[in-house]
Amino acid sequence: MTQRGRAAKPTGPTGRPRRTGGQRGTDRVGRGGDLATRRARLHQVVEPVVQGAGYDLEDLSVSRAGRRHVVQVIVDADGGVDLDAVADVSRAVSAALDAAEEVGGDIVAGEYQLEVSSPGVARPLTLPRHWRRNTGRLVRFTVRGGPEAVDRQVTGRVVEADDERVVVETDAGRTEWRHAELGPGRVQVEFTRPGEPDAFDGTDEAGDFDDDDVEDEER
């Protein structure tokens, strides 16, 4: 995860006045308009940048952390996202936000921190591409039982996945399901995966930085 931020200062880098605070007890994303409108504008700025860099925008959220907003951008791609890619996307998104605010005013009011990261294993598998990108992993998921049957939990290894179906190998053998039959999947953490002598090598995934690796720029 990379972090960039904008401090609450009287003026920004270009001399444009910035608001240094918001209304107490509110979660405003920007000046004027309602929260939903500002969130939509944020999405319109961020998504083309992420897609233009060759990645999928998996999530975009805004939250409050004390006096500042936190803008969290989660990106992914086939083959995963490495540290350099996360840093590149972070710089590109930060520049796009600055440019958009120069034209149309603040999108995020006052102080904000931009965090860009990869999904990590904790995020649920909800789209066909999520299952495809986790081929070979052990996943726990719900098989929907339909109107007259009971949902059941299944744990198995994803063998194949495309836009229509998922093939999972369990203790009972291989079974194919359509995506419509499945609830969200959860990747199960394995320290040693089949065919690997030791899958835990002590390295961090793209979304996990040590403190020394985090870039925190105050603007």
Swiss-Prot record:
Record InterPro entries: Ribosome_maturation_RimP (IPR003728), RimP_C (IPR028998), RimP_N (IPR028989), RimP_N_sf (IPR035956)
A Pfam family of this chain: RimP_N
Compartment(s) where it occurs, according to its Swiss-Prot or TrEMBL record: Cytoplasm
Main localization category: cytoplasm
Comp. bias intervals (Acidic residues): 198-219
This protein's record includes keyword Membrane: no
CDD domains the record matches: YlxS_C
Family listed: Belongs to the RimP family.
Function: Required for maturation of 30S ribosomal subunits.
Protein name: Ribosome maturation factor RimP
Gene name tied to this protein: rimP
